[in-house]
Amino acid sequence: MKSLLLTVTLSSLVATLQTYDDLPFISEEDKLSGVWFIKATVSQRREVEGETLVAFPIKFTCPEEGTLELRHTLASKGECINVGIRLQRTEEPGQYSAFWGHTLFYIYDLPVKDHYIIYCESHPFQKISQFGYLIGKYPEENQDTLEVFKEFIQHKGFLQEKIGVPEQRDRCIPIHDSAHQDHKC
């Protein structure tokens, strides 16, 4: 019975999103205010084989209409890097720009409550880099939204092998921290 329900739910989600150009953009920035969890990522870069993909919560704030601020921690080579990005809404629906217009963010509202896709195109130095995130309000996996994300990124030209489902962690602890030598970021 559960598999039948899952199949029906998934089929309706996929049918709803048949044309991904019609996937609705977020309508109100304040819907994103709060803490979010990265459920899946995709990027053109090849990730290091055998290395665990780790994600930390993202915090969005909406200081004024048309502006989103994103605070996030990244782990790189055992170091914790705190990142703050200010996104400014453009004239295009669902589009936000950052880094002097070199990076465009598109925020898609999914039919599953409290889930969004953030798709980014970065154009620094005439190179184009694309990446995407499936985010949710809660850290637990949601198979339905993951399937929608897979279909979405395939439509954008990514290979499914590039999808990463990260291990959720509350906070980043640098590996050089002697109290936590066994804990890698």
From Swiss-Prot:
Cleaved signal peptide residues: 1-19
UniProt record similarity statement: Belongs to the calycin superfamily. Lipocalin family.
Record protein name field: Vomeronasal secretory protein 2
The organism's place on the tree of life at top rank: Eukaryota
Cellular localization per UniProt: Secreted
Annotated function: Transport of lipophilic molecules, possible pheromone-carrier.
This protein's UniProt keywords: Disulfide bond, Pheromone-binding, Secreted, Signal, Transport
InterPro entries according to UniProt: Calycin, Lipocalin, Lipocln_cytosolic_FA-bd_dom, von_Ebner_gland
Name of the gene encoding the protein in the UniProt record: Lcn4
GO molecular-function term, one example from the UniProt record: small molecule binding
Presence of keyword Disulfide bond: yes
Disulfide cross-links: 80-172
Record's GO cellular component terms: extracellular region
Natural source organism: Mus musculus (Mouse)
